[in-house]
Amino acid sequence: MRPELLKGHLDALLLAVLEDGPRHGYAVIEALRDGSDGALDLPTGTVYPALHRLERAGLIRSDWETVSGRRRRAYQLTGSGRQALSDQRAVWEQFSTAVTALLMRNPWPATT
């Protein structure tokens, strides 16, 4: 998928991946890739800065955990993050409906 298509949608996708519960950064990357059948195989240099931005905005929070002797950060939605995800889903629904209607229209009405 072309990176420019992701612009403006990454935050909503990250919030959606965290909706079911906490995930560490690499698990977020895997969920995006697996949930999109490989179309969203994003580098850590894209995902981690976005996670940190969402945390600074108060939409997610993180906690350190130790697994098999290794420390890693687990991210999860806050109440504000859940509300933001709900709002972004509504906007996406409206946008995708309009774009689909335009792209699939055939034939276009004649203009005078």
Over which residues does each language-model region extend?
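Amphipathic alpha-helical dimerization/coiled-coil segments
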Residues: L85-T112
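N-terminal helix-turn-helix DNA-binding core of bacterial DNA-binding proteins
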Residues: R2-T46
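Basic amphipathic alpha-helical segments that dock to polyanions
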Residues: V47-L54
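Basic, amphipathic "hinge/linker" alpha-helix immediately C-terminal to the N-terminal HTH DNA-binding motif
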Residues: R70-R89
